[in-house]
């Protein structure tokens, strides 16, 4: 599992860990930076251990992606059974969030306007742009100016097909 990072580069955000610990500890207790760093080191090792076990399970099943079931089985194999219930709960919440997530629609689908109407509007805009361009050419110089032809939407569509 070498993705360009050395093991000593793997870590957790120190400020986030500090805040989590501070929220849990009673107000009269303090948490030193050294203790925080040791906790982070232990957490990273735990994550590495579980993910390595889950990866082995995944490979034995000839799967390419580690799924929640692989993590649950890894927790069982490593005898971290006390984490399984919460892991299942989080996995179920995640699955529900994914189901409820609104699928992003394209601008075309959201517009409520048919393809033909959009093409008509585009043609109209191009026509107006051509008129403005012609008028600018006439107004700015009445001597030798060559207008550049702008293809219509139907001409462009015909060339693409």
UniProtKB/Swiss-Prot annotation:
Mark out the compositionally biased spans (Basic and acidic residues).
93-107
Q: Name one GO biological process term.
A: negative regulation of transcription by RNA polymerase II
Coiled-coil positions are: none
Instruction: List, for all copies, the residue spans of the domain called Histone-fold.
Output: 11-75
Kindly list the GO molecular function terms attached to this UniProt entry. protein heterodimerization activity; RNA polymerase II general transcription initiation factor activity; TBP-class protein binding
Which SUPFAM superfamilies would you find in this protein's record?
A: Histone-fold
Q: InterPro entries given for it?
A: CBFA_NFYB_domain, Histone-fold, Ncb2
The question of whether tRNA processing is a record keyword is answered with no
Which keywords are on file for this protein? Cytoplasm, Nucleus
Q: Where is this region: Disordered?
A: 93-116, 130-161
CDD domains per record: HFD_Dr1 (cd22905)
Location of this chain's protein in the cell: Cytoplasm; Nucleus
Gene Ontology CC annotations of this record: cytosol; negative cofactor 2 complex; nucleus
Polar residues compositional bias, start-end: 135-147
Sequence similarity: Belongs to the NC2 beta/DR1 family.
Question: What is the protein named?
Answer: Negative cofactor 2 complex subunit beta
């Amino acid at each position: 599992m070498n993705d360009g990072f050395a093991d000593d580069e793997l870590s957790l955000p120190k400020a986030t860990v500090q805040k989590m610990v501070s929220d849990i500890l009673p107000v009269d207790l303090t948490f030193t930076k050294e203790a925080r760093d040791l906790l982070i080191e232990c957490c990273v090792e735990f994550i590495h251990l579980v993910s390595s076990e889950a990866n082995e399970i995944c490979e034995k099943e000839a799967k390419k992606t580690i799924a929640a079931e692989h993590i649950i089985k890894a927790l069982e194999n490593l005898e971290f059974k006390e984490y399984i219930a919460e892991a299942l709960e989080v996995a179920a919440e995640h699955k529900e969030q994914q189901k409820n997530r609104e699928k992003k629609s394209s601008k075309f689908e959201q517009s409520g306007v048919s393809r033909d109407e959009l093409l008509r509007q585009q043609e109209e805009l191009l026509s107006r742009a051509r008129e403005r361009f012609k008028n600018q050419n006439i107004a700015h110089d009445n001597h030798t100016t060559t207008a550049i032809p702008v293809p219509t939407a139907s001409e462009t569509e015909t060339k693409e097909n």
